[in-house]
Amino acid sequence: MLIYKQNNLIIYYNREFCNQNIKFQITDTERFRKDTKIMKEQTMQKVHSLFTGWNQTIIWSCLDGTMGQIIVDDDSNPQSALAILGINSAFAFFAGKPNLNLITTAVNACSDLIMVPQNTEWANMIEKYCGDQVRKFTRYATLKDTKFNIPRLQLNIEKLPPEFQIHSIDANLYDQCLQKEWSTDLVGNYSNYNEFKKLGLGYVIVNDQSIVAGASSFSSYQNGIEIEVATHPDFQRRGLATIACSQLIITCLDQSLYPSWDAHTEISLHLAQKLGYQFAYKYLAYEIEE
């Protein structure tokens, strides 16, 4: 990991994949004090303890150094921590003792941001600082031990109409995903195709040489991915998302990866349940209103 200091915060991130990190860390690099030491094992244990029991793969991505950053208030004895991941759109998870500096850092890092507080104290601080800038809403977590019905998923894939084709995301399709706003998040958290190929995984459905739907990795962690699914508005309600997700899930299982699903809406939760996922719990989140 590389270590930088900014505004009395300590920022840790993966050296190899630093280019995919949050914008403020790229643009302000020259202002940081570079420190070549590796995060002390004792410090990392304390950071892990701040997030104990929080079964969110984006947090796992940051903690295991695959993607994203861990930002803490103190290098030797952290009391507050932020796990943040994303480029065009980002998630920020706040743990430990509420710290306004961590909230302002996250808000300034990305305009398309979802913030998740660990407790009421964090939530109150977010609401007080952000005011009308944020929208409070409910997200839906699923269990992380789903036993999928593979034959049923295969049947979903076989329902693909003949005028559509499903492809794994290659370099050309990666670039195509970035050209449209609705499909950007399918690959947008990987700074280039080589990073996506190494860490990510995804499928798109094509009609007349244009991408119309897809299911891919929003993020990656050591043992799996967090699923992102998107469909062009003109092609919704045709079962294309179900088909793309079914193919992605099967491929993940073939590669011993867990395809995690965290639902933004009840509609997303219903799709997840259709694919075999089981609801775990609701949780509070805040979205920056652009």
Model-identified regions with their sequence ranges:
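Acyl-donor-binding surface of acyltransferase catalytic domains
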Residues: 4, 11-16, 26-32, 68-175, ...
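A short helix-loop-beta-strand connector motif used in the catalytic cores of GNAT acetyltransferases and
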Residues: 62-78, 194-203, 225
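Conserved GNAT acetyl-CoA-binding A-motif
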Residues: 111-119, 252-264
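A conserved beta-strand-loop-helix scaffold within acyl/acetyltransferase catalytic domains
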Residues: 194-224, 228-232
